[in-house]
Amino acid sequence: MKKSFLAAAFTLGVTLQPAQGQDFTAAEAHARLGIEAAEGQYLGYASLCDLEARIRNVNLPKQRKPANAKQGERRPTNGYRPKPTHIPATQVFDNLWFLGTASTTTWLYGTEEGYVLIDGLTTDSQAQKYVIEGMEAAGLSPSAITAILVTHGHGDHYGGADYLAERLGVEILMSQKDWDLVATLGVHPRFGAPPRTGGIVEDGDVLRSGSSEMTIHLTPGHTPGTVSPIFKVHDGDNQHVAMLWGGTGFNFGPDVEIFQTYADSVQKMRGIAKASGVDVFLSGHPRRDGSVKLLAQLSSRTDDAAHPFVRGAGGYALFDVLEHCALAQAERFLTQSDKR
């Protein structure tokens, strides 16, 4: 392993080159391509190619209830965790709002005729602060939310969903496989209990709210039933097409088959995105896709300036990063398995 080259790539954004007389392994070759694709727009994803990273599995069934917690009681965020960086509710497009923190966001899609909330943030208190109070401060009506789409069954995306669903009287939507996943999870000390009931979305479903609609695409890998929606956004007279990659991290254990499934999902969505004319690429984690920086650029945008969130053809480098990093990790663990 040329560890010094990998370290340089992650800390400095340097393109990897093999030392004279040395060749990259298959894993290192994919990692190099993934890191190169991340340079510029997608540095937040480059760590996925770290071949020294510990790959944990957060999808395993487990009871994580604190010893002093009552059955079913939702627990507050751990005190030792730093407070998330606050970002005010921000209108990114005419029909798309950013609600959340620099760590985790929920995207509010639609108009006052009807909104779909994409993900539910991490806790009840975050949902209250960033969704309910954030919308009200921006002059929006939380009561116009008609559904909560949870992209995948991890607590940082469903943590506040139950609270919002109960308060607003709306349904939580997930894929069947991720409903099955959350049914195996216990009460998390930070995120609380996972949602237990709601609606099911399937591959190709069209979710409508008011005059807005989005198409749901099943992209397994991050979890068995991760979904990635595609929807139209408007910037004045200009229309664009956005895709939100529903699940990013490799926190499903050193499973070669799942890494390959992840890569297959990336290939699938690359084709769908091109056919749909996608030119806006979003994430539920702003530090991944650079949304924090883009929001700052948006705040100072002049009338004749390009929209910072519209990446155009260059945005498709995201798929190269995700695919090569997934294949790099697959090769890494396949090689380790062969050596046993």
Which role does the model predict for each range below?
Residues 1-6:
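Bacterial N-terminal signal peptides that target proteins for export
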Residues 24-36, 124-129, 135-206, 301, ...:
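Active-site HxH/HxHxD metal-binding segment of metal-dependent hydrolases
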Residues 82-138, 229-250:
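Conserved beta-strand hairpin/beta-sheet module of binuclear metal-dependent hydrolase folds
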Residues 118-119, 144-154, 172-175, 218-221, ...:
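Active-site neighborhood of phospho(di)ester-bond hydrolases with catalytic His/Asp-centered motifs
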